[in-house]
């Protein structure tokens, strides 16, 4: 029987759809379904494998879950997703962090859901708080706190001010303590989703006497698009579970104090 002439785009889409739906695609099954030769489908799968869309196996291909997982780490989750994810752990971390704030101190608070939980707990009206996050500014204003709001361009699904004006404003401050949050950490350091957010975090760290990273354990071992800084730029890490031994050793060598939130 002569094999049909099926456009390459149709064949490739059929393979990807099978992998997406079932996790695996068989050369013989796809060839039979489309009425083309197995050699043609093998070449198509080789192409998809070389491009990283699938993992080539003997007789077929399966989904590249590792690639999909890595790609998802580069994309910032929605505000709604982050607000509900590991919320109890974030509350515990925030409860430990708020104890570090001294009366009449000047404090910097980064953006993010853990930082929001921290801001919700601050009740000392003698504390001066600098924060670029609009949602955090609102919760602080509701609690009648002393807030300094940087100028700049508003950006992000979790809106905050960013850009050169924001950085210049922050550089005029000296903070007793800065509370930072990132998308993830590996042994190579701290990572986040965008260059603009990373620049704000670097500035807060540079202007602070003490730098506290608040991070729930789901972010340990996760990288993202932009490396923000190394562990030598923080003094305290507050998390909710013990770190992997290798990472704990790196932090110990740098004299970073690791606090497990009760």
Where are these regions (language model features)?
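HTH-adjacent hinge/linker in prokaryotic transcriptional regulators
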Residues: 2-34, 39, 43-107, 119-124, ...
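Conserved phosphate- and dinucleotide-binding cores of soluble alpha/beta proteins
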Residues: 2-28, 35-38, 50, 56, ...
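Glycine-rich N-terminal segment of FAD-binding domains in flavoprotein oxidoreductases
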Residues: 107, 111-113
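Short glycine/serine/threonine-rich phosphate/pyrophosphate-binding segments
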Residues: 114-118, 220-223
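A residue-level structural signature of the nucleotidyltransferase/glycosyltransferase Rossmann-like core
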Residues: 128-129, 177
């Amino acid at each position: 029987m002569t094999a049909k002439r099926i456009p390459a785009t149709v064949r490739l889409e059929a393979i990807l759809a099978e992998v997406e739906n079932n996790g695996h695609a068989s050369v013989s099954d796809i060839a039979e379904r489309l009425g083309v030769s197995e050699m043609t489908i093998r070449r198509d799968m080789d192409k998809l494998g070389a491009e990283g869309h699938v993992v080539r196996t003997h007789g077929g291909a399966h989904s590249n879950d590792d690639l999909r997982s890595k790609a998802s780490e580069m994309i910032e989750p929605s505000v709604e997703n982050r607000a509900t994810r590991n919320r109890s752990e974030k509350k515990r971390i925030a409860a430990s962090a708020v104890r570090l704030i001294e009366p009449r101190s000047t404090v910097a608070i980064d953006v993010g859901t853990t930082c929001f939980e921290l801001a919700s707990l601050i009740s000392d009206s003698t504390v001066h708080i600098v924060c670029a996050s609009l949602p955090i500014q609102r919760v602080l204003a509701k609690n009648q706190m002393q807030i300094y709001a940087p100028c700049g361009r508003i950006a992000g699904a979790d809106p905050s001010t960013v850009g050169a004006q924001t950085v210049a404003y922050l550089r005029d401050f000296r903070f007793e303590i800065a509370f930072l949050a990132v998308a993830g950490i590996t042994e190579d350091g701290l990572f986040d989703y965008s260059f603009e957010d990373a620049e704000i975090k670097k500035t807060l760290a540079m202007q602070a006497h003490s730098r506290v990273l608040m991070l729930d354990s789901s972010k340990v071992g996760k990288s993202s698009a932009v490396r923000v800084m190394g562990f030598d730029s923080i003094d305290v890490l507050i998390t909710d579970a013990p770190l992997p031994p290798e990472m704990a050793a790196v932090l110990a060598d740098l004299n970073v104090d690791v606090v497990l939130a009760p």
